[in-house]
């Protein structure tokens, strides 16, 4: 004997069982832990709600530098990257580019290079349209699609924003 009406009932029972099994209390957002590196500035959590900051075009600049296990600092235009000691296991030829566009963005290569310890990226937005919103650094595609909003420290009085990065790619200033 076939029970044609039992499939919808089974689906309802399974849905209720899965719904009850998946609850684990408060699932709301939590504040990120305090980071002493950023001090008393505003820290922006990693939630992609950003738009790229509109700026007067930067001129294209390319800087090449070899950085090794001792670390080093690379300055490209008004932006800088500080790689700490121990972040790289061997000497690496790094290319930093300040990309000419209506957003402030930088691109680092070799693309995909990862660090054993995060590097600190500092970006200026002195040439950008001023907004009251907090600024952050975002990881983008080459077409400037935002992939990830990084936890950042905005210092509006000096018009710089700082974040740590764990790999090379393209980054831009957002709000």
Task: Label the model's feature ranges.
Residues 60-62, 78, 118-120, 160-162:
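Intrinsic-disorder/low-complexity, polar/charged segments enriched in Ser/Thr/Lys/Arg/Asp/Glu/Gln
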Residues 16-55, 175:
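Bacterial Sec-dependent N-terminal signal peptides
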Residues 40, 45-50, 54-57, 67-70, ...:
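Proteolytic processing hotspots in large secreted/extracellular or virion-associated proteins
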Residues 150-155:
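Short beta-strand segments within Ig-like beta-sandwich modules, predominantly Fibronectin type-III
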Residues 1-21:
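Sec-dependent bacterial lipoprotein signal peptides
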Residues 160-175:
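C-terminal beta-strand-rich structural cap/linker in extracellular carbohydrate-active enzymes
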Residues 63-94:
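Predominantly extracellular/luminal regions of secreted and cell-surface proteins
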Residues 28-29, 59-62, 89:
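Secreted/processed peptides and extracellular or luminal domains of membrane proteins
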């Amino acid at each position: 004997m076939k029970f044609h009406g039992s499939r919808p009932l089974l689906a309802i029972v399974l849905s209720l069982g899965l719904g009850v099994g998946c609850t684990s209390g408060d699932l709301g957002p939590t504040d990120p832990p305090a980071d002493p590196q950023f001090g008393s500035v505003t820290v922006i959590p990693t939630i992609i709600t950003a738009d790229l900051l509109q700026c007067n075009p930067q001129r294209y600049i390319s800087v090449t530098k070899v950085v090794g296990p001792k670390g080093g600092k690379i300055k490209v235009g008004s932006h800088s990257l500080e790689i700490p000691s121990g972040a790289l296991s061997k000497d690496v030829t790094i290319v930093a580019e300040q990309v000419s566009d209506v957003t402030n963005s930088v691109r680092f290569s070799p693309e995909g290079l990862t660090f054993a310890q995060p590097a600190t990226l500092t970006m200026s937005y002195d040439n950008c349209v001023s907004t009251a919103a907090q600024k952050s650094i975002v990881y983008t595609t080459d077409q400037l699609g935002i992939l990830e909003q990084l936890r950042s420290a905005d210092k509006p009085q000096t018009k710089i924003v700082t974040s740590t990065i764990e790999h090379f790619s393209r980054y831009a200033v957002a709000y």
